[in-house]
C-alpha cells in the first residue's frame, strides 16, 4: 500500500543531511518574539479518517516512527497530528521535554490504554499506576516508590536479579562448551524472554518459575502464552475506539480478555502464596517487592495486585528488545564489545561479592544501554495531557492538549548526537553535564517516569555483565534491522547471534 511504500523509502534514505539537521536542531533559537497561536502550528497533511481506516485494515501502524520522523524533517521540530477524532502535538527536542516537566501538575496526566482499561472495568479489577490518572494515581504512586523505585529498594532486589542473570549465563555457556566447536548460533530472543520473566517474577513475588536452565511447568508456559496473546491483541485494538472495534474485532476482544484472565489468575496465585507465608511468620529477611508492600499495608491487596500485574506485563518486551539489540550492536562492533568485556572483568570480583556494585562499577556498560535506547527506544513516545497553557517552539499550547515527545527522532537528531547512526556508548560519558538531562528519557520524566525502571535496568545490566565476561558475541548480519511499531518499537526479525567461548 501507499503508506507502506512511503515508509520503506523513508527508512532507506539518510536521516537528513547535516545541513538540514543543523537547521532542525537550532530552529528553536531563531523564532519571532511574538508567541504564535496554536492554529498557526504546522499540521501533518492527510485525511485523519482515511489514516484511521488504513490502520484498521493493516491491524496496526508499523511505520509510525518513520512517518513521524519524515514529518519532522519536512515541517520542523513541532507539528499537529490528527488521527480519527483525536489530535495531538508532536515534538522531538530535549528542551520541550524540560518545559513539559516544568508545567507538570501534582497529578501528571497521560492517555489511558483502552483495551487494558476495558478489561479491568469489565472484570471489576482495579487499575495500577500505569493506567490511572488523578489523585488515585498519586496515592498509589507515592506508596509504591519506596519498595519499587527507590535506591534502597534496588539494593534489596538486585541480588535476586543477579542470581537469575548468573543462571542464564551459565546455561548459555553450557550450550556453548557442549558443542564441539565451542560455539553456538541461535535466535536468543526466546531465551531472553524467559530470563526477563524469571527475573521479574523473582523480584516481584519471590518465586522461581524454572524458565532459565530448567524445564518450565505447564502453569508457567500458560502464563507465557497469555502474555504473548495479550500484547498481540493490544496492538490490534489500541487504535480503534472500543465502540467500533467491539463490532469489527469481537474475536480479538475475546482473546484479549481470556489472556488477561490467565495473567490475573497467575497473579492471584502468587499473592495468595505470599499471604499464606506471611500469616505463618514474619520473614526475617527480604523476600520480594510484593511481600514488602503487603507487610507495609499502605495499599489494599487489590491495588497491590493491580500494580504487580502491570509491572509483570510491562517488564517483558520492554526489557527483551533492548537486550537483544544491545547484543546485536556489540556483535557488529567488536571493539566496543571488547571494551565492555574488559570493564566487566575488572569489576567481576567486586560485583560477585556485592552485586549492588554493578550499578556503579560498570559505567561503560550503562552507557551502552543508553546508546541502545537512543537508537531503539522501546517506548516510541512520551506523552502528557498538559494541565496548563504553555509555549513550545514559540507556539501557544492550550491546557488539555495531548503532547507527544517522539524519542526515535530525538535520538537520531545529528544536531544533538553527531553521527547518530553510529553505535558509540562513549558519547554518553562525554556529554554528561548541565543542559543534557533530557537527552536520555526512554523511561519517561518527572513523577510519571516508569515505575519499573530500576528493575528493568538491573535485569539488562546484570545479564550483559555475566554474558560478556565469558562469551564472545558475533553475527554475520551487518545491515540494520528494520524496526516496527507494535505498541512498542521492536525488531521485525530477530538476528541470529553466535556465542563463542573465550579462552
Curated annotation (Swiss-Prot):
It catalyses: a steroid + 2 reduced [adrenodoxin] + O2 + 2 H(+) = an 11beta-hydroxysteroid + 2 oxidized [adrenodoxin] + H2O; 11-deoxycortisol + 2 reduced [adrenodoxin] + O2 + 2 H(+) = cortisol + 2 oxidized [adrenodoxin] + H2O; 21-hydroxyprogesterone + 2 reduced [adrenodoxin] + O2 + 2 H(+) = corticosterone + 2 oxidized [adrenodoxin] + H2O; 21-hydroxyprogesterone + 2 reduced [adrenodoxin] + O2 + 2 H(+) = 18-hydroxy-11-deoxycorticosterone + 2 oxidized [adrenodoxin] + H2O. Its EC number is 1.14.15.4. GO terms for biological process: aldosterone biosynthetic process; cellular response to peptide hormone stimulus; cholesterol metabolic process; cortisol metabolic process; glucocorticoid biosynthetic process. The keyword Iron applies. Disulfide bonds: none annotated. This is Cytochrome P450 11B1, mitochondrial. Its cofactor is heme. Keywords: Heme, Iron, Membrane, Metal-binding, Mitochondrion, Mitochondrion inner membrane, Monooxygenase, Oxidoreductase, Steroidogenesis, Transit peptide. It is an enzyme of class 1 (oxidoreductase). It is a peripheral membrane protein. GO terms for molecular function: corticosterone 18-monooxygenase activity; heme binding; iron ion binding; steroid 11-beta-monooxygenase activity. GO terms for cellular component: mitochondrial inner membrane. Belongs to the cytochrome P450 family. Heme binds at residue 450. It is found in: Mitochondrion inner membrane. Residues 1-24 form a transit peptide. A cytochrome P450 monooxygenase involved in the biosynthesis of adrenal corticoids. Catalyzes a variety of reactions that are essential for many species, including detoxification, defense, and the formation of endogenous chemicals like steroid hormones. Steroid 11beta, 18- and 19-hydroxylase with preferred regioselectivity at 11beta, then 18, and lastly 19. Catalyzes the hydroxylation of 11-deoxycortisol and 11-deoxycorticosterone (21-hydroxyprogesterone) at 11beta position, yielding cortisol or corticosterone, respectively, but cannot produce aldosterone. Pathway: Steroid biosynthesis; glucocorticoid biosynthesis; Steroid hormone biosynthesis.
Amino acid at each position: 500500500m501507499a503508506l507502506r511504500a512511503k515508509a520503506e523509502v523513508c527508512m532507506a534514505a539518510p536521516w537528513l543531511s547535516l545541513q538540514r539537521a543543523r537547521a532542525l536542531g537550532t530552529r528553536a533559537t531563531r523564532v519571532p518574539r511574538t508567541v504564535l497561536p496554536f492554529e498557526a502550528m504546522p499540521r501533518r497533511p492527510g485525511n485523519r479518517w482515511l489514516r484511521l481506516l488504513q490502520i484498521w485494515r493493516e491491524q496496526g501502524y508499523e511505520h509510525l516512527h518513520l512517518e513521524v520522523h519524515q514529518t519532522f524533517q519536512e515541517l520542523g521540530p513541532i507539528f499537529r497530528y490528527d488521527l480519527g477524532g483525536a489530535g495531538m502535538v508532536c515534538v522531538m527536542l530535549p528542551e520541550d521535554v524540560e518545559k513539559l516537566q516544568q508545567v507538570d501538575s501534582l497529578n501528571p496526566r497521560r492517555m489511558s490504554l483502552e483495551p487494558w482499561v476495558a478489561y479491568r472495568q469489565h472484570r471489576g479489577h482495579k487499575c495500577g499506576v500505569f493506567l490511572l490518572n488523578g489523585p488515585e494515581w498519586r496515592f498509589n504512586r507515592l506508596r509504591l516508590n519506596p519498595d519499587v523505585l527507590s535506591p534502597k529498594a534496588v539494593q534489596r532486589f538486585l541480588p535476586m536479579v543477579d542470581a537469575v542473570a548468573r543462571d542464564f549465563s551459565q546455561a548459555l555457556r553450557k550450550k556453548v562448551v557442549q558443542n564441539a566447536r565451542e560455539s553456538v548460533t541461535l535466535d536468543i530472543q526466546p531465551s531472553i524472554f524467559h530470563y526477563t520473566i524469571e527475573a521479574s517474577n523473582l523480584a516481584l513475588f519471590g518465586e522461581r518459575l524454572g524458565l532459565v536452565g530448567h524445564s518450565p511447568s505447564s502453569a508457567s508456559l500458560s502464563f507465557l502464552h497469555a502474555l504473548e496473546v495479550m500484547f498481540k491483541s493490544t496492538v490490534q485494538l489500541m487504535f480503534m475506539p472500543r465502540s467500533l472495534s467491539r463490532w469489527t474485532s469481537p474475536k480479538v476482544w475475546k482473546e484479549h480478555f481470556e489472556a488477561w484472565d490467565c495473567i490475573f489468575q497467575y497473579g492471584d496465585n502468587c499473592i495468595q502464596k505470599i499471604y499464606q507465608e506471611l500469616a505463618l511468620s514474619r520473614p526475617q529477611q527480604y523476600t520480594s517487592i510484593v511481600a514488602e508492600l503487603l507487610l507495609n499495608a499502605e495499599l489494599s491487596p487489590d491495588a497491590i495486585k493491580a500494580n504487580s500485574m502491570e509491572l509483570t506485563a510491562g517488564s517483558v518486551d520492554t526489557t527483551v528488545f533492548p537486550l537483544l539489540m544491545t547484543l546485536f550492536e556489540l556483535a557488529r562492533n567488536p571493539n566496543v564489545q571488547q571494551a565492555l568485556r574488559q570493564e566487566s572483568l575488572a569489576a567481576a570480583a567486586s560485583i560477585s561479592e556485592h552485586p549492588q556494585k554493578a550499578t556503579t562499577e560498570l559505567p561503560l556498560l550503562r552507557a551502552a544501554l543508553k546508546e541502545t535506547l537512543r537508537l531503539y527506544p522501546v517506548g516510541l513516545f512520551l506523552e502528557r495531557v498538559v494541565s496548563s497553557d504553555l509555549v513550545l517552539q514559540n507556539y501557544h499550547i492550550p491546557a488539555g492538549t495531548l503532547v507527544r515527545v517522539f524519542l526515535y527522532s530525538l535520538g537520531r537528531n545529528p544536531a544533538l548526537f553527531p553521527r547518530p547512526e553510529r553505535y558509540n556508548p562513549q558519547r554518553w560519558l562525554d556529554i554528561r553535564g548541565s543542559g543534557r538531562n533530557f537527552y536520555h528519557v526512554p523511561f519517561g520524566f518527572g513523577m510519571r517516569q516508569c515505575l519499573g525502571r530500576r528493575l528493568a535496568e538491573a535485569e539488562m545490566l546484570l545479564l550483559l555483565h555475566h554474558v560478556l565476561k565469558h562469551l564472545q558475541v558475533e553475527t554475520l548480519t551487518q545491515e540494520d534491522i528494520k524496526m516496527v511499531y507494535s505498541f512498542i518499537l521492536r525488531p521485525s526479525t530477530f538476528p541470529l547471534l553466535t556465542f563463542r567461548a573465550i579462552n
